[in-house]
Every structure is written in structure tokens, then in C-alpha cells.
Design a protein with these regions (language model features):
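Conserved signature/switch motifs of ABC ATPase nucleotide-binding domains
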Residues: 53, 84
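Conserved H-loop
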Residues: 85-92, 94-101
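Conserved ABC ATPase signature
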Residues: 33-37, 41
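Helix N-cap at the start of a conserved alpha-helix in ABC-type nucleotide-binding domains
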Residues: 69-70
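Hydrophobic anchor residue at the start of the ABC signature
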Residues: 47
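Catalytic Walker B motif of ABC-type/P-loop ATPase nucleotide-binding domains
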Residues: 58-62
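Conserved ABC ATPase "signature" region
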Residues: 12-29
């Protein structure tokens, strides 16, 4: 079940987990097996598990894949809030997601070998 998998080595209270599940729209699936959830719900469970880890660095690979616009916005807000004290590398194919989430943006293309790194300040000062 979702809740049981969330508490493996966790020391955090179930109260915080319930709040975070509500924030991500996962209320009501606490006792379901992850394999029974939709793709979008599984994605949010994966984000929840990653963000609750006691790690200084997180790699988030396409964390918004399969999410509708409203759920994507909630998930972005959750990651921003929970990730304030963490270093995160977020991989995405969506430049708008990168601009919304990143302090620094690295774009690369295999086709023409372009690698560009910018500080994300909406004016994007290149380094």
C-alpha cells in the first residue's frame, strides 16, 4: 500500500505524510497497491517518496510526465516548497518546466552538439 511504502525508514509523523498526500491529490489511495494506481498517481507517489528522503541531492527525471496541467502545477509547488534546502537536478524535455523550476538551466542537443548553461532570472544571463 502507498502509506506503508512511504514509512520504510522514515521518522516523520503520519500527520505530515497525510498532508503531503493531500497536497499532491493522493488522498484516498493510502491503502492501494502502487501497481493499482494510474500512471499519473504513480508519478506523484514517486515524487512524494523522493522529496521525503533525507538527502542533500536529488535527481528528478521527468517528474511531471503524465500529469495534467492542474496536477502538474500542484506538483511543481510541492517540489519547490519541499526542495528549498536541497540541491536538485531536474531533467525535462519541456523548456517551460525548466524555466519554472530551475535556478540554472542547461540545454543540450545531441544533433548539433550545443550545450548552453544559463542562470534563470527570466532575462537569462549567460555564463
Amino acid at each position: 500500500a502507498v502509506r506503508r511504502r512511504m514509512f520504510g525508514k522514515e521518522k516523520r509523523s503520519s500527520c505530515h505524510l497525510v498532508e503531503e498526500m493531500e497536497e499532491l491529490g493522493l488522498s484516498g489511495c493510502e491503502n492501494q497497491a502502487v501497481s493499482e494506481l494510474s500512471g499519473g498517481m504513480r508519478q506523484r507517489v514517486a515524487v512524494l517518496r523522493a522529496m521525503r528522503m533525507d538527502a542533500d541531492f536529488l535527481l528528478l527525471d521527468e517528474p511531471f510526465r503524465g500529469l495534467d496541467a492542474g496536477t502538474k502545477k500542484k506538483t511543481m509547488n510541492y517540489i519547490r516548497r519541499k526542495g528549498k534546502e536541497k540541491t536538485m537536478l531536474l531533467v525535462t524535455h519541456d523548456l517551460e518546466e525548466a524555466e519554472a523550476m530551475g535556478d540554472w538551466i542547461c540545454t543540450c542537443s545531441r544533433l548539433d552538439g550545443i550545450l548552453e548553461i544559463k542562470r534563470n532570472s527570466k532575462s537569462s544571463t549567460e555564463i
